[in-house]
Every structure is written in C-alpha cells, then in structure tokens.
Amino acid sequence: MSLRGFLGALISASLVSACGGGNDEPSGHSQPDAGGEDASDASAADAGDDGSIDDASVPDAPADAPVDTDATTACGTASECALADEQRASDKMDSIVNDPTALGQFLTAVPKGGDLHNHLSGAVWAETYLGWAKSEGNYCITNSSLALSTSCGNTSTTSPVPTAADSLWLPVIRAWSMQDFVAGAETGHDHFFATFGKFGAISGSAHHAKGLADVMQRADSENALYLEPMLFSNSTAGNVGSAVWSGGTLTTAALPGFHAALLAYSGWNAAVQAIVTDITNTESGARQELGCDGSSPDSACRVGSRYMVYISRSGSGPAVFAQMVAAFEAAKIEPRLVALNLVGPEDGSTALSAYDRQMEMLGYLHTAYAGKSPLHVTLHAGEITTKYLPTSYNIANINHIRKAVEVAHAERIGHGVDVLGESNPTELLYELQQLGVMVEIGLSSNTQILEVDGTNHPLATYLQYEVPVALATDDQGVSRSSMAGEYMRAVQDQKLDYKTLKLMARTSLEKAFLPGPSLWTSFEALEAVTECAPTASSYYGEDPAPAACQTYLDTSDKAAMQWELERRFREFEAKQ
C-alpha cells in the first residue's frame, strides 16, 4: 500500500463525532509495527472518545491521473473550468460524507495549506518516541509513572523500553497520549497535560531535528504545504532574567529599566544566539534526516517551515520577560524565527494570576520593537472553560482573548474556545473580524482537554461573524490525530462543507507568518495582484505560472506558497 493509501486507511472510519479507534502511527516512516493489544488489532467498534485514528483496511488510491488545464475545453474560460472542477469536488464530498472510508481518503488528499498551531514535542507519536529510545539504548521506563528516564540502574523500579510485542507497550502509549482514554478520577484535561512529562526525556532539543523531519513527512503525506511549529524554549535567557532582576515583583513600570539591563548583561548575546543555533541545528538536522540535499530527497523536503519560540506561562516574571526579549532580539538576525507564543494550561494558578502582567509585557515590547524586530505574536487565549476554572474566578471577567488582542497585540489566537464567555462577545467577534485576527482551531484537543465539541464549539460562530479561522493539529501525537483527522472532525462534528474547508486552507497561508506580500489584493473577493490575475486562458494555480506572475512570485515566499496551494487545488479538483 502506498503511503497516501496507508494514511487514507488510517483516517477512514475515524473521528465520527468525537469517536476514534485505532492506535497506529499515521506515518509509515519511523514507526515499529504495533502488535499484541496495539491499535493494529483495534476495530471501529472499539472506538472511544480519545480522538484516535482508526486503521481501516482500504485499497490503494489509483495512481494520479494527468491534469488537463487546457482552457479551451467545453467548460469555457480557464476560470469557468476551474470553478466547475471545484463544484465537482464539492459534490463528490457531499456524496461520500456518510462513508467514512471514502471520506477519509478524500480528506487525506485535499490540499491543506499550513498547520499554524503545532507543538513539536506533542506532535511526535508515542510509538516514534519509543522507537528512538529503544534504538539509542540509554533509556528505561519508570514503573510507577510510566515516564521515560535515563536513570536506569535500579531494575526493581524500572523496566526496559518496550517493543510492540511487550505487555508494557500499550500501557506506555496510553500514558503518553489520549489513546483509549476514558475520564474517571483523572480528567482528559489533566491526562493530556500530564503526557508531556512522560516523554520529556526524549522530546528536547537533542531530538528536535528528528521530530521536525517526522512531522514534515506526515504533513507531506496529507498534502499540507507549510508548518509553523513551536520548537524552542530558551532557558538560557530565562536564567539571565532571573539573575539580572533582584527587585521583587516585576511591575510594568519597571520593564524599560529591566529591558535595558538585560541588553547590557555580559551573557545576553549568548542567550540570544542560543535561539539561532537551535533553529540552525534543527533545520539542518531535519534536512539531513530527509536527504534533502542528496540525490533522492524525501518528498517531505518540499514542506515549508518557519519557527516559533515558546515560553511557559508558569515561569517567574523576570524569566518570562527575558525570554520574550530574547525572541524579539533573535528575530532581528534570524529570519526563520517568525513568532513567539505562551504555552501551558491557561487555567493554571500562575497562568491566571500572571496573565494580565504577561500581556502588558508583550504590549510594552510591541512598542519598544516597532520597526526594529519583525517578530510576530500569536497567543493561546480562550483555551478555558468554567469546568476547569478555579471557583475564585468569574469566567465573564477573564477576557483572555480580548486582552491578548488589545493589550499584547496578538495577530493570531490559539483555540479561542471561550469567546462567547467573554464580556460583550459580539463586540469582540466584530473586533476580531475587523482586525483580521485569525483563530487557530484545534478540534481534537478542544474535545479532549475541554470537552467542547459539536454545537458547543464556537467554530460556527466564528464563521458566522467572518472571523478568519484555520484548522490546526495542536499536539497530534498526544491527540492521536493529524491534519486529515482535524478535517474529518470538521466535516463530521462541525458539518463543514468542501468550500469552507478550502477557504480555511487558503486562510492558513494568508495568515501565515511567511515573508513577502500576499498573492491576493482582496482575499475576501479572491482577487489577485495584477501580475497573477486570471485571463481567458489562465487561472490561479496555472503550472507553469504566467511569466509576469512568476516574476512576482519570485519576490514573495508567501505568494509563492499561495500559488502552489492553488496549483494543488486545481490538480486535486480536476481528478474528482
């Protein structure tokens, strides 16, 4: 079975409403075959509410047929032909919406634009981590917690890293992910966030290159073009911040002076350079893993990527601020670094108490670095519900989304589940629409962490108010999902149609932090720059692009990626 056929099989019969069943890794690149009780033996009838992906046996998709983009066919102009193909693809999806196998294959093949909300450590599947740990040989499993460890001297408290044939295999996968999870004494919220500590011994910077290569392969196999993974924290900068600050609570008024002190500190340049070094090592290592510079490069080498720094919400004020400053400084010299984000449970005690102060830090830096650093800001905000909020807080007074946008100047929002719980939500929705703030939608993790899905999810509301939205994986390894899995949820749980999925894919690239101007002069009207405007004989995505258009595309990474998305849509739709 081809890789694409394999992935179609994995997605098929899965994610009906909130259900999922299989346990297999959805990429055939580095996973050992699961055995025993692993997902290869699970059936759709055993599907649970963990968002996992079912492995239904389906035949390979037929080989790709050549695409006829000749505008002289009976449909009329090139534009008319392209729109006719689009409608045929839409009709095709409508006709198979109740056939999970066919729908899974269809959605795996659909072009998906970019995955803009992707935590690298949570994107790698448990089976992959176990394979690395087994092959490297210096790891073991702590019996009491099922966490990976390098302290393996006591054989009475640790066990060897399991293989698929071992009885410990499935319990470890369940501990490291949402596989087969059923809420009880432990909530989905708590289990989800606890997984990261279980595999933390192998998810750090030493394995970022292998992790990035793995995620690029999975993206390519599902026809995604672009990634913006959250890759790097910067403990070096955090340590500098803690060392430099000695004034008690870091107030907003003290930020300018502390900022200057950081820049003057003798070890500061090394803290900034640590980010640049991490990016260089990770990207070059991933390219080496994929053979991108060799004679037979992996097709995943064509997946574009830019990177984010992530900062834990639970850090001390001086450490968090220093990490923010380091990111703004690093972006001045490293163009592959495009954004920062704050991570960790938004309803944690420190995250709640420090939220306003952290937004003020970003607001200060927005002004301080205006015109000096190209760094963007995207923030987790609104990933919160009353169920997990401490009783001392009134959710209507939280207003995390509003503060992220108005105070911290976030250009994108991650999750935004609580938008209707904020004060004056209608005004906020209009503000998001007017400012063009995109919401990164993670349907699987919203179901698993917050228990929000179906009509309780705000995705339909965002679409109603024309707020830009795009689907994202969040932590696909922990969730046991993928981009195709998120598309399946969007269709089956959120009842989205083909043209809405296509709009969201286009939106993901329009709102990506790629350099260069957009292909579109009016994204809403789908009107391109003059050089790339349709003619009677050419339409968006023409291959090759018209000469004047190609000249424009050569000046903009963003526009070039957008044109490639249109080309893939043309190719996909012509086959339906």
Where do the model's predicted regions map?
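Sec-dependent bacterial lipoprotein signal peptides
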Residues: 1-17
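Positively charged, low-complexity intrinsically disordered regions
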Residues: 5, 30-32, 296
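Compositionally biased, intrinsically disordered low-complexity regions
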Residues: 7-10, 22-24, 30, 37-38, ...
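Residue-level signal for mature regions of secreted extracellular proteins and peptides
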Residues: 12-13, 68, 74, 542
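Ser/Thr-rich, Pro/Gly/Ala-heavy low-complexity intrinsically disordered linkers and tails
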Residues: 17-73
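Metal-cofactor-binding active-site regions of metalloenzymes
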Residues: 73-576
